[in-house]
Amino acid sequence: MDRILKLLTWPAAVFIAGILLWYEQYKLTGNQGSVWLFTVLSDWLGIHGYEKPFRLGVGTAEIVGSILVVLPWTRIPGAALCLGIMSGAIFFHTVSPLGIDPYHDGGQLFQEACEVWLCSAFILFAYRREAVAMVERIFGIHLPRIA
């Protein structure tokens, strides 16, 4: 069963990279919609005028996550990074003035964030033993064994 789950991480990783890299063209080129979205967020957070570093920082993190999740030897940290980024996206869409449908397109951006989050969580589940071992190695702690 674990072998099948690990094989299924390939399409999940490609899906994650495809979605994240598709939106980079908007974040990194200063697309009007992307600038508006990050301006709303930075103003809501009380850090007025920091739209550009916020937008470029998220975009850069998404590119790094996309690369890491596709490479088999870095899939675990890549999935963890993508899960964290998408957790932030989902959080800000649900609690900030953005809402889940900021572009009035039926909430496509929010839906894709949820899909990327689910694929990232699936990858971490498929590699759960390796992920736990990695955390133990990095932090020098012992975690309870999971099935």
Name every feature range the model reports, one short phrase each.
Residues M1-A147:
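Membrane-interface extramembranous regions
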